[in-house]
From Swiss-Prot:
Transit peptide region: 1-32
Protein family membership: Belongs to the AIM23 family.
The keyword Transit peptide belongs to this UniProt entry's keyword annotation: yes
InterPro entries associated with the record: AIM23 (IPR029427)
Protein name as catalogued: Altered inheritance of mitochondria protein 23, mitochondrial
Compartment annotation: Mitochondrion
The encoding gene: AIM23
Keyword entries, A-Z: Mitochondrion, Transit peptide
Membrane listed as a keyword: no
Alphabetical list of Pfam families matching this protein: mIF3 (PF14877)
GO cellular component, one term: mitochondrion
Principal location: mitochondrion
Length: 356
């Protein structure tokens, strides 16, 4: 058996370990490189913390953006600069005096109060037919030096919608109606301030009432319906001080959509006479007309009649003025004071008209 000395084995093992150690550890830690090594370690740890913070912030932003995408994030709406002021309807008039423009604008304002879209019906001055329109288009081309606007009727479509019937009138008449409107408005303000006696409002019906009401009546109406329903409707309007115009025509014509345009020709003289009706039909129409005269005799002045019973008729009614009792001296004094104020107002308006 081969015998190897123990000292040789130990020396070989030591040689192997030394070579292994020298192979892996080529750089030794010494005093010279201690500070630089510490700085590297410290900078590495600092960088690691910064990266960790950035990662955490990025993760939080991603989570928020995922929960609330940009297009769904609700932001407070910016309040418009003139949010409290509603958009004003403006129609530019190129003709007419300032007074004529004010009168036209007051009619336009009233139209938009009754129909916010400005839809109206107009009477064509050439064909005298009623046609639908809009005030924005209808107002274009109107010469306020010659003509003006007036609402002659209001058609109730439903609880919310109304369509005014607008007609072109002479400029002089339009200015007169606007002056009456301003006087009426001023009187109301004085009553609210207590300058005028409010009880006077219940004693006198305003003579300048511009509110004109239209009522259709068929020649074939039953006597009971005429004396009850129609009579109540007519008398109620007259008591309120409204002017009322009654339109009498055949049942088929009065219920048509363009019924009003059939009466336009009655305001002008017509040539020729309509064909004579059978005696029974004529007597029926005469009875209807006589009943209407009896109904309105107490509440209206003498009616103005146009047309004839063989075709169609118009009855124009103006309410009677309410006169105070002779023993009511205070009411009589108020009435005379009112008349003096009206005369003074007319004198002022006449002076303004002459100055224009």
């Amino acid at each position: 058996m081969l015998k190897v000395p123990l000292s040789d084995v130990l020396s070989q093992k030591m040689l192997f370990l030394k070579s292994f150690r020298y192979f892996h550890c080529t750089k030794y830690f010494s005093r010279d490189n201690a500070s630089s090594t510490t700085d590297i370690f410290r900078n590495a740890m600092k960088r690691k913390r910064e990266l960790a913070n950035l990662k955490e912030q990025s993760h939080g932003n991603v989570a928020r953006n995922a929960a609330f995408p940009k297009e769904y994030i609700k932001r407070p709406k910016q309040v418009p600069r003139n949010a409290t002021n509603r958009k004003k309807i403006l129609i530019t008039w190129s003709t007419g005096t300032d007074r004529a423009k004010e009168a036209a604008n007051s009619v336009v304002s009233e139209i938009f109060k009754k129909n916010h879209k400005g839809n109206i019906k107009v009477v064509d001055p050439t064909t005298h037919r009623i046609e639908p329109s809009n005030i924005r288009y209808f107002a274009k081309g109107i010469d306020l030096d010659k003509v003006g606007l007036s609402i002659v009727n209001v058609e109730q479509i439903d609880n919310e919608n109304q369509i005014p019937l607008v007609k072109i009138i002479e400029s002089r008449v339009a200015l007169k109606k606007y002056s009456d409107f301003l006087a009426k408005k001023k009187e109301k303000e004085l009553m609210e301030l207590g300058v005028l006696n409010k009880s006077y409002k219940n004693l006198v019906t305003d003579k300048k009432e511009d509110n004109l009401k239209h009522i259709k009546i068929s020649w074939q109406i039953e006597s009971d319906d005429l004396k009850r329903q129609k009579a109540h409707e007519i008398v109620s309007l007259l008591k309120k001080g409204n002017k009322v115009t009654l339109y009498l025509d055949d049942k088929n014509n009065i219920n048509s959509n363009n019924w009003l345009e059939n009466f336009e020709e009655l305001d002008r003289s017509q040539k020729g006479e309509p064909p004579r009706l059978p005696e029974s039909v004529f007597q029926k129409r005469a009875a209807v007309l006589e009943t209407l005269k009896e109904i309105v005799s107490e509440y209206a002045n003498d009616p103005v009649l146009l047309g004839n019973m063989n075709s169609k008729m118009i009855m124009k009614l103006i309410p009677k003025d309410v006169k105070p009792q002779n023993n009511d001296k205070r009411a009589l004094k108020e009435l005379r004071k009112k008349e003096r104020q009206e005369k003074l107002q007319k004198r002022i308006q006449r002076k303004k008209m002459n100055e224009m």
